């Protein structure tokens, strides 16, 4: 890694300013969307994917947060999950780890087994089976991450008319074109009894690097260093060509699980041959809505499309 040309004093001044601003965003969110509405803070939760950027967010707010939360998608690299657990333990930060519901796992989705349980569409297959491409990312996000966060909220908010939970997310404006649209809405957004706060909206990658220089105790996730993504979700919707081979080089057990699932999907006959291959989309389709927690995959997808343009 090349040495920084910025002086330690300049780094320290910049990070002090950014840190104060980030905490001010959280203060504003609590004041405007909790206290002003005569609600109580049920929890301040860091959404911790295990990536190096989310680790910086977690380090920044670990002394103010009541919990960290991790969506165990069931289709990710176990080393990242363990990294999240170990990091939270070392900081004394309670971790809430949530999983997909039984019968609605990633495996169930790609095998076409997930059906609506309630409402007018009860019994209807929600996903026909096969692996997702970019246009189907939103379905995977809803099932593997969004519902996990709903469980976190429900754990902490006992009375939504009196309490609100604050989710701290690591969304940044410079990550990608689509996620910049999310950031343009502002760093604070209330959705029902959940207040979403993105304190790093205006941070750049250089700022994140500077934070680590000022705070050398911030840990690193080996998975992120090797794959340039956290690896907590390998749904494959935003996978690039050759990604599974890259995963196999460093984490062969994970790649073997995905390849075994490919064979299972192929044998089931639920999907056309093209969709029996993990990561088949590789930028072929226009992506659908982007999830609040899908930062690294989304940014990498944009970068790869830019290279191909």
Where are these regions (language model features)?
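Nucleotide-activated chemistry modules centered on ATP-dependent adenylation/adenylyltransferase
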Residues: 1-309
